[in-house]
């Protein structure tokens, strides 16, 4: 089974955009938090990240909670920012998208392990 995946895109030398996809069958078991925390820790400790951010659709409650559990702050929400799906008539369905972010110094404060 594939539980999910986490990924990071390097925006510049010290800034990364992160994201994840997880199989709904494994929700609520802590896998997403463990995997995402591992990714953030790697980026801050090994890859030289200073800032990490991610985009989350406003109605994706689980991903928003995950960002908050990771210590990321909500920095804003873009109205009708992006679309990944279509409406029933085939037209693009634009979704409100929030930005969550965390700095290395914040991560070091909350992740003392």
Language model segments and positions:
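Acyl-donor (CoA/ACP) binding surface of acyl/acetyltransferases
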Residues: 1-113
């Amino acid at each position: 089974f594939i539980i999910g995946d986490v990924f990071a895109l390097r925006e510049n030398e010290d800034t990364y955009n992160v994201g994840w996809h997880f199989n709904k069958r494994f929700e609520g078991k802590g896998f997403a938090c463990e995997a995402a925390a591992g990714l953030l820790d790697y980026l801050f400790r090994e890859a030289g990240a200073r800032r990490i951010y991610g985009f989350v659709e406003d109605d994706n409650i689980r991903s928003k909670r995950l960002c908050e559990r990771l210590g990321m702050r909500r920095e804003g929400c873009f109205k009708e920012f992006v679309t990944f799906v279509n409406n029933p008539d085939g037209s693009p369905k634009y979704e409100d998208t929030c930005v969550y972010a965390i700095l290395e110094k914040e991560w070091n404060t909350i992740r003392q392990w």
